[in-house]
Amino acid sequence: MKPINILLLRPESDDPSAVDQSLGARLSALEGPASSDLRVEEVSFRSDDPGDMERQLAFWQGKVSGVIGATNVPQSTRLGELAEQTNLLCFVANNNPLVWHGRGEVFHIGLPSIQTALAVASLLQKTRYRRIFLLHDQTEFQSRVASSMETALRNHGMEVAARSALFDGDFEPVREWQADLIYVVFSSESKALPVARAIRRHLGDVSLLFGRSLLRESFLSSLADIAGETWFVDMFHRDGAPSRDQQHFAETLSAHGIKVATANHGFGWDAMTFCARALTAGNGEPALAIDHLESGVAFEGVTGTCAFTPDNHNGRAGFGPTTLTRWSNGCLEEV
């Protein structure tokens, strides 16, 4: 069989999401379950130049059958437009349906916010926490995450309060509400860390929960001076019984100096694996690969299962892979 040629496209940026996704995709291409007969070219584009992504893709047109984008929502949306124009199978990690926009070539495998919210609420219902305060960033995405989470928690019988980011002078209402758990709904480490420290100054050792995007080595190191119970939304079984694919994934990252696998490592790994498997099934032809993907066949990955249809290019359903993980004494353990 002829080699499968895939382009890995990422912005020239130190954004942790793009860095982790591209590393996960690169390692999947080298050592993942679909790495045989796979050739990957990695290129970057200037995010401050609206035309640079198109120029990079134009250079590789006719030389690759698929493209993996380690890209944010606006970048992924543009990449999807270009993939449609150039007949490339395209995989990205975003969960926003605007990225797909009904394009046959585009598959987006991020976990939907509502699915994650329902899973987290179900898991928290099994704990001692019943009064949960949501502190969220003011971005559109995090406000939407907080709204989904608030609804899910209420539907699971818990008391919930929510508001956007607090500063030192704003903590009295939170103290009076007497939360069992504060869920810090932020993606940015530089924003989340000051909020966590302010909570500790004003509210003592109330339990904290952070989103899965903050479960990174750099953020864990920054938490060293923050005492108290600290949990994370997660998607891996850190100290339990991982699947064979998850174990191989974690061992591969560890061999390359990554001690804590992130969700974005996983999304990059699975995007590359799924794209390669589909193109292999389609003998390198994007149209045949899309037919295979849309047939509903289950793609098992380290981030869970995807089963795509013509009407669903996200492929996620049910409870999903969501777990809760405790950070305690320098170790991660599943709750």
PLM-predicted stretches and their roles:
Residues 1-335:
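Extracytosolic ligand-binding ectodomains
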